[in-house]
Structures are given as C-alpha cells and as structure tokens.
C-alpha cells in the first residue's frame, strides 16, 4: 500500500451549518434501552426507534472494564480495565462496560455517546471490543461472568425470524467450490446506455497446441528467454517449424495454431550477451532448447463457458489467447505486468529526483457475457531518466555534488537508488557496453587502486583511465560505481556512465513524485476514451501477425452496455434542524440547515501548534471558528480550551504532547478527561503526523484532529464543516442515518438483526522485505441503523493476504482450549450494543484479486463459521461474502459526453450507475457500481463479486444496499466509491501502520488519492497462515481511544 500523503484533512464535501439542539430532558438511573437518546440540554433522537417522545436518560458514573477472567475467555488482554466513557447508543448514561451508575436529572451539556471502537488484535490474545451491555440482567456496577455472557448469547430470541436458508457446507477444496450463479439481472433504476473500455474478441476456430520449452543453461530473465526463442524462430521457422509463428510466454510454454512437424526436438542457439560480464567482455553463449508437445488446448470448453453451459472458466485457453495478444506489444514496448510502456505513446513528464513518467496501456483478455473481451486502459508508471549518472545523482540529492563531499546518508541514498540499474559507458566512443550496478565503492575514486598483474602491483583508477583511454577523471572526490560480483568487482567512475533508457523504477516513490504521477494519470473521461481508441488503432490488431496466425479478431469500437442509475437514498438528520431529511443530488449534499443526528460532546480540549507560520492569535481564531462550526452542526462544544494554544517544534513532539496533556489534566477536576486535541501541522510535516497519532492513541489515550497550515490560513466554511463531521464521530457522535434503515425497509437487513463486516489487508511498500502486513476487520454495531462500526487490527506475516486472526484457538494452562479472534469479538460486541445476536452476516472483503478468490473464501468463510460455532452450538447465521475490487481497469463512459443529463460536473457517468450485463461474468453474481460523483479524472467503478450467498440476495437487493451504504460514510457529505465497511477497514489498517513503522515515512501529509493501498503493486501471498511466524505486535491502544472511531 502506497502511502497516502499524511494530513488529517477530510475528503472534500459539502458546506455545513446548522444550529444547536435545545429542549427539556429528564433522566434518572439507567437510560432506556430501546428509546431515544436523551442527554443534556437537547433531545437526541438516537437508538433504534427514534421515537418522538422524550426518553429517560441518566448521567452514568464510573464505569468498569471487563475483569481478567472474561478477557481470557474471549481472547482479550488481562489489562482490559478502565474508566467508562460513554454509554451505548440506546442508553443515556455515561458509564463503563457494566453501565454507568445512575444520577439525578441531567442538566449539563449532552454527554458523549459511545461509538463502537477499533481495537488491536495480537496473537494469541485480543483487545476485546468494548461496547456496554444493554441487557437488563446486567448490574450497573458489575459485568457478567464469561459463562453468563455466553448463556445470554445462547438465550437470545430468534422469534424475529430464524434464517430460512439452508446453511451450505464449506467444500474442502477449491475444486468443489461453485461461486453463486447470477440471480437474474437487476431491474431497479433508470435505464441508460454507457460505453465500456472492452473490445469484443472473436473466438478463433484454430487447433491450439501447447509445447513445453526447456532452455539450458537456465536463466531467470524473461528477456533472455524471449531473445533465445526469437532467434530460434528466425532461424528455423520455415525449415523446422512448419512455417508456424508460435506464441511464447517467456518461461516454459509455447503455443501454436496447429501442430509442429514434431513431438519433440532439440535446437542449439547462439546468443550474444547484451550486458558486459566481470571480465569486461560480451560473451557469446550457446543455449540448448528442447521443445516438447504437452497437449492440445481445447477451445470447446471456453465456448461452452462463455455460453453459460459450463461453470468453470478454462484458464489455460484464456491464458493462450492472452499470450498471443501480448506477443506483438512485448516486442514493441517495455512490458510491466499486464501493461506496456513506451516514450512514444505519450509525452514523458518529469517526476523529480531523476525519475520521469511514461505513458502506456493495460491489456487483458477476459470472459464476459458478450463473449471474449479485450480490456484496454491507459496507465502511467515511473521510469529512471536516461541521464548521465552524475546528473542523476545531482537530481537525487537536489544539489550540485561538486560543491561539497558526500555524507554517509548521501552514499546510502545513492547506493539504494542505483543498485540494479543498468548503465552504458560513454568514454569509448561508439562502443557502448552495458553493465549493471551492484554497489558503490567505500572510498573516493582518487583513493581507489586495483592489482594489474600477478605480483599484485597496484594502479589507481585515475591513472588507468588516463593511460588506457586518454580520459581524465574530473570528479575524483566521488565514489566509483561497482559492477560485476563482489568477488571480482569492476570499477566505473560515475562520469563515464549513462543510465540506459527504459528501466522502470520499482522502488518506493516520495510524496512529490506520487503527486506528480497522479497529476499525469488524471484524465477527463472524454480524453481517456480518445486515448484508448487511439491505442487500439495504434496496435492495429487486424495486422498483428500473431493475431492473424491464431485467428483472433478484435473489434475497434468500445462496447455499448446497458446500465441503470439507482436512485440516491433519503438521509435522516436531527429533527431540531430546519431539514430533518435530505435527498442527495448527484452524489452530494451539504450540512446547511441540518444538524447531526447524534451530536457528540467536547467539554475539554487543547490545541498544539507545530507550524512556525501560524502565530498564536491565528491559532486561537482558527480553534474558535472550528468550535463554532461544531456547535452549529449539532455538537456540544465548549468554546474555551482548557489551556491556551501553545506553539512547539516538531522535533519535540513527544515531550510537548506529554507535558501539555499532563498540564491540562491537572487543571481539570477529578474524573474529567481531555476530550479532544486539535493539532496544527506544517504542510510538509515529515513523520510528525504518524508520531503524533501513535503517541496520542497508544500512550496518552486522547483523540486528535490534525489540520494543515494551508487550511488554517484559508479557514473556509466547507473545510470546517468537513472537519466537524470527523470530530463528531471521533468523540462518539453520529452524523446521519438512512431513512430506510429507520423505517425497516432494507431487504435482508431490516427484517432481522444483521451485522455487516468490512475487511482489508494493507501490505508494506515494495522493497520493505521484513515489515508485516496489517489486517483490519470492522463490523456494524447498531441495528437497524447500520452506521457505526467497531473494528480490530492486527499485524500478520509479511505480504500475507489471508487474514490470520479471524478465528484463533489456543491452549490455556488453566482453562484448556480457548477460542477467540476478530470475528468472535465483533459478534460479541454487536450483541452487547444491540441486545441481539446477528441472524445474518454480510461480509465485504476488499483487496482480493481473482486468482485469490478460492483461497481467501475457503480460509475466511471457515473462520467465520468456527467463530460463530464457538459462541453457541449450532449457531450458524447465513453468510453473504462479497469481494470489493478497485484495482481493475474497467472504465465506463457516457454514451454522449455532451448530454448534461447523463454526466456529472466532471464529465463522468452519474453516481448510482450499475452494470450487471455484457461486460460482467458469464454466469456468476457480479456487478460494477459507480456510487460516487467524479471530482477530477475518470471515475473508477467498484467491482463487487459475490463468492458465497446463503442469504439469497436478489441483484436489486444487493446492488441497492451497497449503493445506499455508500451515502453513510462519516467523513464527508458525498457518496463514496466503495462501500463504507471496506473503506473503514482500509482506514483502520492504514492508521495501524503508523504505530508499527513511524520512522519510515518521509512525508507526513496524508491526502486522498489512489496510492492508499501502500505497496499494492507488489504480489500478495495466499499461503496458509503461519501462526508461529514472529511478527512484532502492535502497541496497545489506550482505553479512551478504543471506544471511538478515531481512525476517521
């Protein structure tokens, strides 16, 4: 997951204003479990019923954490005890896990509502989710014993409707799996036609043959393999290959349209090495190539699959066609994954630090409902500029390297950037030999000597170049490049080397480079469509010798696809605002005349300013304006801080945070806590953001809101309104709810208690070989509202895609076999916060590629089943498992870019556009949904693929649910591009990486963008989880932070 730039600014959204709630309230003892949420001087119609009449809500007292015994029973750490902070949504109390002690009539400002919290799970124990129990049997001063809680879970009534679906047994292997068939096509919404970047490919009627290729001596480079096979075809096509033009995958497989005149044959091929060896000579190498018939590639089954008469996709046949269509572009362009790049496809753009962006295109053959489809999209990536090495080093260090000696840090940076890079020498005229850099010399060139004879006579590199080549080295203070192996290294002065063109930069980009690359890739839909069509014309598949050889014909026009535009959902806000409900327009709305449905409380807050540009008086003004915006949006926000804003230097972040926190808490009366820390950051803040979040959330126990200097100076109302939304959910409030959820009108969600999960795994950046992956799982904790999400995060094995800690089982010396895990903890939390056990599970899983579908489903569905069974014998609620994919290359364009009724302001298709025909899977349950309005560039629809469905969703049911949930994202007044549970899981995992590796960031502003997944370009492992792998655990979150959505 590339990291986003680190700021805590919210996504862009609507403007916000409103007024504070006011009204009578009475309360005593414990709050009503099912009624409205009453606190302070206003009536918050929260909870499930949203009843108009005032409800009783007491001010809770001191809360208590779960005892150690309970923690061990359910996998939580023994230290899970602490002060309560906020009652559940259906209680009016301020209390702990056992509920607060009731007080008299409440007269103060509204107390903070609890919100499900995100926790950190470590193996083998977990920090259990903390939501207060709402069972009437629980004493307000005592939490239930583990056995009691388990009994309560079992005793929950299922009279609201037991699942009628038969629970399907999980197959033992992927071969037995059948993904759900499409339950018909959706009918809801306004019908329209869109264009997709899919091009119809006519299935060939040729006889395809598969041959195994063995090249000895074996090489790891596909480029060398291809060069060998090209030489073979050039030499022997007419004489030995029956005039066939084979397609080669660069490894072990060769395919032909029709048989070769032999079943097995050996060839000898001589090839001149492109690179110079350790002795300075280009070797001519002989390769033995054995080509042996393996099988015929059957296209009959592919035709049956495309017609829907066969459920399993014949992967080999698809692979053959993909290899055939990649042959010509592989010879013309530079292949990177499934994409091809060239300086001729588009204008190169500088990315800084010696890098530049190249334009290219993505190409992949796919089975669809319309038959075979060639998916083509534009792409860009970073290449190393083909400059002299001296110039590259100057660009990398951003200075003239002749002005002062290189520091140790400079040498490390240069070595890291140049290792593995191919260079050519320039001091020998037209003889441009190529070498690959293996390192830098430890000493300067002027100090470097080497033996020239058997008597170990030493000669300096400076002398050698002058005597041998007549070249006088100018930059003798610089180290030499080292090429060849460590046993027999060669030394090349930097100034005689030039970087060879066409080398992709695969290491991690810095913030400036990411910004520049995003700017290059950002294209308006009409421009992207034109470039895609131009690429198809440039590739000219009709004249592609390989396509002709195999009988593949590619259409030259974009596919026209039937689509529907789903209506936006009505949203519920607090009745005391002028507008109690809202219907979003084109995927967005604003907070004007509206108030948060449940405003949180900030009584005690402080501000720390780390920006030298922001003076104290400006910091005070900014905080006052922000407090006012929170107030008018529906929160109870004290306009005066506990202490005046203080300025500090970023390098003293830990000392300042702890000192200021101590000073502020000392000033408060006993039992009071700091509710919020407002932080002003420099625009370029390095690792400050990550350090600050780590200290606040794992050491001090305080939620924080970071604001960049540029926003402090602008002080725009829209920015303030968005920050208010984030602050509200961080302190336990809720911004809005779906009207259909309150009126129980969501199919297969509202009829019985339903829990919605979101899960994601973020991986380290390429090159970080030892850092763990971070898994996050969130789950809804309110029903029927489904807006609040608790979660768990854990570190797991490097690049492990399967979530290892979904279900855990281990032996305890006293208790014997103990079960725990993320799913179990979240199910228990749902039970505590709603009073119901989930009778239906919907699981949105982000970040899974098609090749991982079977492994992820087999492992994670099994973990869900085991977690449920560990809570109650026979407890198996029906599960729907949906993969959410954003890293695909399907783009949808309006049929007419000039029709204002079919595009949004950015020229993209309208939010709510759903496609489940033609370009979708021939038989399985999948769809593309563009749930958001575009801001800039071309919108990427999310692809949802149902891998398991025991709830028997209709197409309309799942599509509408997914689209409507996209309007409930807490951080902005816009619909978002992926379903919020998956989005929250990603945010949680991303935040947890700050705890794990705060020192690795070289730029701390976090901005929205496509680099959020952090290292997503590198491969992911689906090996079976190794529970014994040593993974450094995440530092524990503090109790005050656990109970709020601090990651928003």
UniProtKB/Swiss-Prot annotation:
A GO term from the CC aspect:
cytoplasmic ribonucleoprotein granule
Q: Where do the PAZ domain residues begin and end?
A: 388-501
Which named protein is this?
Answer: Protein argonaute 1
Which residue ranges have biased composition labelled Low complexity?
65-81, 165-174
List modified residues, type Phosphoserine: 1001
The record describes the protein's role as: Involved in RNA-mediated post-transcriptional gene silencing (PTGS). Main component of the RNA-induced silencing complex (RISC) that binds to a short guide RNA such as microRNA (miRNA) or small interfering RNA (siRNA). RISC uses the mature miRNA or siRNA as a guide for slicer-directed cleavage of homologous mRNAs to repress gene expression. Requires DRB1 for directional loading of the small RNA duplex (guide stand and passenger strand) onto RISC for passenger strand degradation.
**What InterPro entries is this protein classified in?**
ArgoL1, ArgoL2, Argonaut_Gly-rich, Argonaute_Mid_dom, Argonaute_N, PAZ_dom, PAZ_dom_sf, Piwi
Q: Principal place where this protein is found?
A: cytoplasm
Q: What outcome is recorded for mutants in which this gene has been deleted?
A: Narrow rosette leaves. Single shoot bearing a terminal inflorescence. Abnormal inflorescence with infertile flowers and filamentous organs.
Picking any one GO biological process from the record gives: adventitious root development
Write out the annotated subcellular location: Cytoplasm
Positions with a binding annotation for a divalent metal cation: 760, 846, 986
- Pfam families in the record, alphabetically? ArgoL1 (PF08699), ArgoL2 (PF16488), ArgoMid (PF16487), ArgoN (PF16486), Gly-rich_Ago1 (PF12764), PAZ (PF02170), Piwi (PF02171)
């Amino acid at each position: 997951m590339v990291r986003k730039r680190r700021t805590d600014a919210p996504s862009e959204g609507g403007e916000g204003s409103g007024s504070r709630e006011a009204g009578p309230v009475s309360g005593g003892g414990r709050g009503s479990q099912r009624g409205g949420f009453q606190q302070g001087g206003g009536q918050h119609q929260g909870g499930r019923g949203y009843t108009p009449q005032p409800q009783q809500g007491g001010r809770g007292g001191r809360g208590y954490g779960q005892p150690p015994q309970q923690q061990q029973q359910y996998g939580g750490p023994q230290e899970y005890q602490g002060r309560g902070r906020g009652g559940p949504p259906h209680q009016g109390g301020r209390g702990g896990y056992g509920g607060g002690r009731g007080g008299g009539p409440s007269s103060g400002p509204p107390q903070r509502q609890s919100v499900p919290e995100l926790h950190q799970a470590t193996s083998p124990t977990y920090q259990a989710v903390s939501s207060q129990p709402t069972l009437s049997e629980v004493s307000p001063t005592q939490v239930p014993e583990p056995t009691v809680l388990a009994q309560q879970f079992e005793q929950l009534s299922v009279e609201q409707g037991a699942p009628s679906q038969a629970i399907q047994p999980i197959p033992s292997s992927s071969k037995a799996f059948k993904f759900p068939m499409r339950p018909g096509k959706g009918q809801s919404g306004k019908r329209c036609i869109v264009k997709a970047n899919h091009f119809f490919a006519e299935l060939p009627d040729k006889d395809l043959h598969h041959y195994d290729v063995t090249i000895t001596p074996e090489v790891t480079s596909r480029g060398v393999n291809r060069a060998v096979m090209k030489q073979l075809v050039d030499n022997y096509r007419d004489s030995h290959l029956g005039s066939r033009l084979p397609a080669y995958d660069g490894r072990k497989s060769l395919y032909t349209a029709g048989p070769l005149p032999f079943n097995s044959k050996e060839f000898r091929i001589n090839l001149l090495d492109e690179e110079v060896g350790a002795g300075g000579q280009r070797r001519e190498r002989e390769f033995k190539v054995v080509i042996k018939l393996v099988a015929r590639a059957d296209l009959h089954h592919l035709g049956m699959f495309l017609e829907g008469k066969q459920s399993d996709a014949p992967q080999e046949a698809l692979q053959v066609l993909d290899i055939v269509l990649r042959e010509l572009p592989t010879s013309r362009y530079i292949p990177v994954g499934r994409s091809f790049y060239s300086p001729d496809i588009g204008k190169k753009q500088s990315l800084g630090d010696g890098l530049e962006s190249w334009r290219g295109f993505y190409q992949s053959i796919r089975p669809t409902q319309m038959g075979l489809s060639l998916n083509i999209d534009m792409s860009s990536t970073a290449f190393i500029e083909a400059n002299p090495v001296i110039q590259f080093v100057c660009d990398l260090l951003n200075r003239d390297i002749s002005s002062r000696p290189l520091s140790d840090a400079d040498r490390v940076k240069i070595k890291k950037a140049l290792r593995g890079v191919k260079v050519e020498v320039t001091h020998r005229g037209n003889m441009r030999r190529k070498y690959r850099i293996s390192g830098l010399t430890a000493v300067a060139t002027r100090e470097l000597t080497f033996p020239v004879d058997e008597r170990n006579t030493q000669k300096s590199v400076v002398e050698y170049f002058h005597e041998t080549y007549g070249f006088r080295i100018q930059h003798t203070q610089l180290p030499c490049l080292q090429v060849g192996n460590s046993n027999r290294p060669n030394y090349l002065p930097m100034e005689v080397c030039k970087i060879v063109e066409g080398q992709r930069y695969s290491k991690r980009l810095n913030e400036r480079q990411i910004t520049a690359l995003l700017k290059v890739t950002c294209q308006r839909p009409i421009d992207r469509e034109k470039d895609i069509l131009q690429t198809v014309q440039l590739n000219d598949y009709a004249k592609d010798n390989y396509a002709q050889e195999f009988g593949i014909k590619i259409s030259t026009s974009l596919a026209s696809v039937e689509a529907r535009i789903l209506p936006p959902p009505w949203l519920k806000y607090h009745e005391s605002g002028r507008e109690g409900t809202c219907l979003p327009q084109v995927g967005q709305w604003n907070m004007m005349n509206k108030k948060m449905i449940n405003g949180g409380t900030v009584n005690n807050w402080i501000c720390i300013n780390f920006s030298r540009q922001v003076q104290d008086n400006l910091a005070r003004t900014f905080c006052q304006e922000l407090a006012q915006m929170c107030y008018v949006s529906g929160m109870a926000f004290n306009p005066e801080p506990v202490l005046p804003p203080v300025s500090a230097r970023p390098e003293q972040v830990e000392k300042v945070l702890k000192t200021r926190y101590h000073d502020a808490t000392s000033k408060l009366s006993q039992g009071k806590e700091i509710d919020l820390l407002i932080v002003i950051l420099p625009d370029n803040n390095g690792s400050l953001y990550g350090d600050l979040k780590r200290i606040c959330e794992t050491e001090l126990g305080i939620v924080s809101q970071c604001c960049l200097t540029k926003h402090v100076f602008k002080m725009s109302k829209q920015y303030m309104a968005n920050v208010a939304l984030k602050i509200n959910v961080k302190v336990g409030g809720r911004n809005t709810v779906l009207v259909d959820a309150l009126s129980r009108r969501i199919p297969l969600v509202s009829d019985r208690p339903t829990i919605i999960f979101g899960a994601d795994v973020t991986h380290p950046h390429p090159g970080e070989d030892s850092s763990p992956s971070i898994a996050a799982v969130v789950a809804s904790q309110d029903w029927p509202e489904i807006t609040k999400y608790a979660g768990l995060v854990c570190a797991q094995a490097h690049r492990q895609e399967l979530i290892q800690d979904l279900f855990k089982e281990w032996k305890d010396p006293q208790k014997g076999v103990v079960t725990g895990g993320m799913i179990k903890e979240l199910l228990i939390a749902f039970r505590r916060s709603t009073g119901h056990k989930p009778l239906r599970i919907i699981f949105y899983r982000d970040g899974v590629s098609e090749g991982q579908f079977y492994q992820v489903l087999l492992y994670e569905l099994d973990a869900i089943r085991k977690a449920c069974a560990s809570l109650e014998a026979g407890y198996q609620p029906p599960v729907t498992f949906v993969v959410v994919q954003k890293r695909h290359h399907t783009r949808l364009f309006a049929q007419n870019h000039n029709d204002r009724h079919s595009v949004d302001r950015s020229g993209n298709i309208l939010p709510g556009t759903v496609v489940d025909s033609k370009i979708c899977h021939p038989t399985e349950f999948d769809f593309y949904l563009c749930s958001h309005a575009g801001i800039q560039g071309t919108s990427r629809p999310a692809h949802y693929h149902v891998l398991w469905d025991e709830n028997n969703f209709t197409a309309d049911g799942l599509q509408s649910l997914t689209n409507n949930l996209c309007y409930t994202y807490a951080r902005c007044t816009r619909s978002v591009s992926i379903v919020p549970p998956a989005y929250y899981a990603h945010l949680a995992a991303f935040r947890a990486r700050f705890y794990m590796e705060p020192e690795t960031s070289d730029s701390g502003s976090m901005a929205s963008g496509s680099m959020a997944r952090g290292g997503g370009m590198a491969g992911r492992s689906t090996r079976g989880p190794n529970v014994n792998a040593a993974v450094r655990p995440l530092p524990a979150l503090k109790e005050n932070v656990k109970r709020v959505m601090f990651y928003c």
